[in-house]
Amino acid sequence: MASSSDSEDDSVMAVDQEETALEGTMEQDEDPHPVLEVEETRHNRSMSELPEEVLEYILSFLSPYQEHKTAALVCKQWYRLIKGVAHQCYHGFMKAVQEGNIQWESRTYPYPGTPITQRFSHSACYYDANQSMYVFGGCTQSSCNAAFNDLWRLDLNSKEWIRPLASGSYPSPKAGATLVVYKDLLVLFGGWTRPSPYPLHQPERFFDEIHTYSPSKNWWNCIVTTHGPPPMAGHSSCVIGDKMIVFGGSLGSRQMSNEVWVLDLEQWAWSKPNISGPSPHPRGGQSQIVIDDTTLLILGGCGGPNALFKDAWLLHMHPGPWAWQPLKVENEDHGAPELWCHPACRVGQCVVVFSQAPSGRAPLSPSLNSRPSPISATPPALVPETREYRSQSPVRSMDEAPCVNGRWGTLRPRAQRQTPSGSREGSLSPARGDGSPILNGGNLSPGTVAVGGASLDSPVQVVSPSTPSASDGYDLKVGLSLAPRRGSLPDQKDLRLSSIDLNWDLKSASSSSHVDSIDNRTVAGSVRHPPEQTNGVHTPPHVASALAGAVSPGALRRSLEAIKAMSSKGPSASAALSPPLGSSPSSPGSQSLSSGETVPNSRPGPAQGDGHSLPPIARRLGHHPPQSLNVGKPLYQSMNCKPMQMYVLDIKDTKEKGRVKWKVFTSSSVVGPPETSLHTVVQGRGELIVFGGLMDKKQNVKYYPKTNALYFVRAKR
């Protein structure tokens, strides 16, 4: 009964509230002023009225640095939510690294602040007090004799480079030093620098100096110690408690070290601990990871020429004698190819290394959030020149051509060998007419038609002649405007490529005897992927539609391959190379190659090369032929198919089972920007910062930003 009476009272109260609401509504209809007050109330709603789940999701887009700190000061609710967001950011990033579910953000192009000088072999560390990354020293690729002693600070909240003008005793200009954080100080130790060019034959200089930098005071201080390690560079160091542990390094004169030194950061005194058992080989350039307060992990390194290490060692720092323990490395085939010049960084129970992608053909990361690269725009036509270049055979005494005026890979002409008939022996080069420029680029463009309307979509290999005489006489014009060659060969056929005419010197008997047979293919069908080695000509798998007046080795090579394919089929195929004068290769419909055989016109579309397309770089090349390419490999591999990939080493079973294991990823998100070496990797708040480094000259670094690039690796949203 009591419950029924209570329900009745509740119903009565509900009715009374409805009546009151109706009366209030009637009064509002009579008086317009309360309506304005209600509308004001609706417009004055704040974010505090949102559900906490929605608010927490919105706050997760804030920068984990200063923006988190500022948002936590708004109210108690936001303070509590920011703590959860920061925790989720950290652990979410660790999980993303373990699963390979990351994204890359690029700061390769000009960003706020004074641009830092391009460098490699520099030192870097993260200082949480002002949420910045500090970079010291290094050297530059433009001058091997130049080393820096400048200090830069990257504000990770604004992504702005700041150069603090510090006072005190500056360190010497050097590279290969280590920079670690101890309390409110940055400790710099070791390093090396190249000698001045004159006088000649001076040795490199190595340092054993210790400098400290105080970010709060903006002050450098030189620490004088005694009975310390010899001058060294390329060593590794870390801080555990109030001790800095230093291992290995290069001592100069091709001498490496495997000694361990300990610096007391309170007393600034060196000591050398007693270590029992076998020890790692002397090395430099290794990575040193802190496992816990009594254990260190040493990974990789270089012991000298042809002595690159991929091993892993544990250093147990017990109260008694210290001891080394070798670790078993599992899934080594899926590990980083090179460890000595690619530093490692710990993220949770994993160690992250950024090294070269194993396949060498993986595309660059599609998640690089930067402005379009200069290599991704459609280039203008290359301006013809009057000089002549001839291809070099990959089999030669020197791996690369010398560097002349900063250009690598200059193709030098060969002596021509004349035959009794007056033509050059084994020559497969074209004879150009006055109005027959050659196409630009390494491929025929998607809309370009070859051999009576057929489109060649895949890279085609030009096989070097088998005989020395044919090799000496092999001639190829690269990016040039040449005078027509008359009288070389009696039979000349007209091969039309798009709107551009190419006059080729055909000699069926000579070409069939000196050119190897190729796989069964038709001009209309797709061509199989050739081997990577070419005859000294480097060609990207896709080049956009070229304009008249441009010359490229790829167009010559592909057209030459079409001639070989047709000449191997007999006289009927050779006759089809000369289309009627009234026919246009770019006319709609299909055109006849021989009786009963037609080839439809190819539609425009991205050309495919090894499973992915690659835009050209001719705009950056200007009117020069490619000069800094890797001889014997296609251009797209030399420039764009050596990306940097994330490798993850699982270290959770290091102490218990004495093993480490490389993780296997199938996701393409681990593939990032072009590979660099001697860069730095620093862990911030829920991200990794990769800065600087040295890019191999074989990756066409002259036309791609290289050594002051800045990348952020974060968890993929």
Curated annotation (Swiss-Prot):
Region of interest (Disordered), ranges: 1-34, 361-452, 570-632
Phosphothreonine sites (modified residues): 378
Residues recorded as bearing Phosphoserine in the entry: 365, 373, 552
Keywords for this protein: Kelch repeat, Phosphoprotein, Repeat, Ubl conjugation pathway
Pfam families: F-box-like, Kelch_3, Kelch_KLHDC2_KLHL20_DRC7
Kelch repeat spans: 132-184, 186-242, 244-293, 295-342
Biased composition (Acidic residues): 1-30
Biased segments, Polar residues type: 416-426
Entry keyword annotation includes Mitochondrion: no
Source species, domain of life: Eukaryota
Domain F-box: 44-93
Compositionally biased intervals (Low complexity): 363-376, 570-595
Reported function: Substrate-recognition component of some SCF (SKP1-CUL1-F-box protein)-type E3 ubiquitin ligase complex. Specifically recognizes p53/TP53, promoting its ubiquitination and degradation.
Subunit comment: Component of some SCF complex, composed of CUL1, SKP1, RBX1 and FBXO42. Interacts (via the kelch domain) with p53/TP53; interaction is direct.
The protein, known as: F-box only protein 42
Annotated source species: Mus musculus (Mouse)
